[in-house]
Amino acid sequence: MSTDKTNQSWGGRFSEPVDAFVARFTASVTFDQRLYRHDIMGSIAHATMLAKVGVLTDAERDTIVDGLNTIQAEIEAGNFEWRVDLEDVHMNIEARLTDRIGITGKKLHTGRSRNDQVATDIRLWLRDEIDLILSEITRLQQGLLGQAEREAETIMPGFTHLQTAQPVTFGHHMLAWFEMLSRDYERLVDCRKRLNRMPLGSAALAGTTYPIDRELTCKLLGFDVVGGNSLDGVSDRDFAIEFCSAASIAMMHLSRFSEELVLWTSAQFQFIDLPDRFCTGSSIMPQKKNPDVPELVRGKSGRVFGALMGLLTLMKGQPLAYNKDNQEDKEPLFDAADTLRDSLRAFADMIPAIKPRHAIMREAALRGFSTATDLADYLVRRGLPFRDCHEIVGHAVKYGVETGKDLAEMSLEELRQFSNQIEQDVFAVLTLEGSVNARNHIGGTAPEQVRAAVVRGQELLAGR
């Protein structure tokens, strides 16, 4: 990347060139060049509008548009030289345009500042990123629905405090993650609505003296509405913070899911098997099969949390309007979007390939007195107050711990020593199937409800 030229667009009032280190220190082109497509898109719309209001001729507009399209092709072919001395993506493209088409290229920036230009670029870029992320969320949710449908009757232990609590189905467990991702989807859709306000036309901070048509530019760029205040237009980064907030919540969900997958693949659980293509080995221990994908996603969540805090800290002390501080908004935003999209892609590929180990999960559900609440509910139906039933079953569990017997393994005589309300029909209640089937209401773990929830989920995805 060249640094041997000094051709800043703002050099007129300066008596000496910028220090070479300062030029590198203040340049952003090393990372904001990824905005090139959206920068060119915004410039084409701006040139089109300038021609409509008579600031440019139609011929000048056409020359500019052709030049910008050629530059985009150069960039995408890898034939474009990014120059640090030109600071950023905007000036690199404008300088190249002027090289190609001459003085007409210098007219493109009429009625525009880099302040509103970059604010527009970032919004256009993030809008596209959100659309890609939403697609990955949907793909992951489709995988979860597939697992839930296949495993609607697969019983596993449900946990609280990571201790066995009650039996649930694996399908029901997968649907819990589906629900969280649905909220993530909604948050990102809402974020997209608020970012889709056009700042272009705000110029440096106060607007412009040219007779611009912001409504036309807004329509050309696909924004929903023109921003209503030029000061806010160039200085607002709420949309980036809101995106990083939504991304942080989504990554928190993926991190929690990752923790479960890491536990479930361990020798201590062995609930699931991950295909080899999602794992790696050890350079010293031949037996190792490490769940690197969920471990990395769990770790990468911290990067996105950091991006959120970085942007909040970046903005908290800035007066209106634009400040150079805002150059620091891009790297955390870019990284947060990349990390979330890659993590979702990894999960969307991996989740459909998970293979539950049915026998092991069932055996685990049989341990830990997982049907104790069912016994208490059984006694409630016999007319006893729940708190009394809770204490009765607590004594039965204590007896089970001492004798090494689960509730279903005790004889009727053993159970009746805790309550004479217990009859032979209690054993149907104490089975794993009896427990999950009894929770047959919307949101419950019964297989019938799992299948109904899958249908609702499929309808939700089809309506997007």
From Swiss-Prot:
Subcellular location per the Swiss-Prot or TrEMBL entry: Cytoplasm
GO BP: arginine biosynthetic process via ornithine; L-arginine biosynthetic process
Pfam families tied to this protein: ASL_C2, Lyase_1
Gene3D superfamilies linked: Fumarase/aspartase (C-terminal domain), Fumarase/aspartase (Central domain), Fumarase/aspartase (N-terminal domain)
Keyword Lyase: yes
GO molecular function: argininosuccinate lyase activity
Catalysed reaction, written as an equation: 2-(N(omega)-L-arginino)succinate = fumarate + L-arginine
Domain of life the protein comes from: Bacteria
This protein's GO CC annotations: cytosol
This protein's name: Argininosuccinate lyase
InterPro entries for this protein: Arg_succ_lyase_C (IPR029419), Argininosuccinate_lyase (IPR009049), Fumarase/histidase_N (IPR024083), Fumarate_lyase_CS (IPR020557), Fumarate_lyase_fam (IPR000362), Fumarate_lyase_N (IPR022761), L-Aspartase-like (IPR008948)
E.C. code: 4.3.2.1
Family (UniProt): Belongs to the lyase 1 family. Argininosuccinate lyase subfamily.
Pathway note: Amino-acid biosynthesis; L-arginine biosynthesis; L-arginine from L-ornithine and carbamoyl phosphate: step 3/3
SUPFAM superfamilies the record matches: L-aspartase-like (SSF48557)
The species this protein was found in: Pseudomonas savastanoi pv. phaseolicola (strain 1448A / Race 6)
Gene encoding the protein: argH
Entry keyword Flavoprotein: no
Assigned keywords, A-Z: Amino-acid biosynthesis, Arginine biosynthesis, Cytoplasm, Lyase
